[in-house]
């Protein structure tokens, strides 16, 4: 039976490249030079600046560099800014994988449309199986059309 997996993966290498490019752009910006910094740790980035408006500019720089490197900005989870001495810090976490709530929502969407496919939750991914390839492609089109708050990739398509 044909099947495919719905996953939400983050390319860590491209994320690192985007953060490195954002750091280089900070060095070129006269208004932010020496006043702001990015600190990357695994799947999180800490923004440090002297004022709140600088944090907003840094977030815009980070978003634009993520888009250039083709990393979807929907996976960003932006925390609230907090003061730390004379500076203001803000954490940005990058989510990866499909959590149980989103997986249930995906399965519910597929069942609600009464497509001739079955969806099963398998850890951090959803496996969709059906008798015809056309039914699977219809399910992919349905999921691409929905706004679920996380970037979805479709992998392991088998006939």
UniProtKB/Swiss-Prot annotation:
Binding site residues for 3',3'-c-di-GMP 1: 33
Protein name: Cyclic di-GMP-binding protein PA4395
Pfam family, one: DUF520
Residues holding 3',3'-c-di-GMP 2: 131, 133-134, 159
Membership in a protein family: Belongs to the YajQ family.
Phenotype on disruption: Disruption of the gene leads to reduced adhesion to monolayers of human bronchial epithelial cells compared to the wild-type. Mutant has reduced persistence in C57BL/6 mice compared to the wild-type strain.
Organism: Pseudomonas aeruginosa (strain ATCC 15692 / DSM 22644 / CIP 104116 / JCM 14847 / LMG 12228 / 1C / PRS 101 / PAO1)
Single GO MF descriptor: nucleotide binding
The organism's place on the tree of life at top rank: Bacteria
UniProtKB keywords: Nucleotide-binding, Virulence
GO cellular component labels: cytosol
InterPro entries noted in UniProt: DUF520, UPF0234-like_C, UPF0234_N, YajQ-like_sf
Function field: Cyclic di-GMP effector that significantly contributes to virulence. Binds bis-(3',5')-cyclic diguanylate (cyclic di-GMP or c-di-GMP), an important bacterial second messenger that controls a wide range of cellular processes.
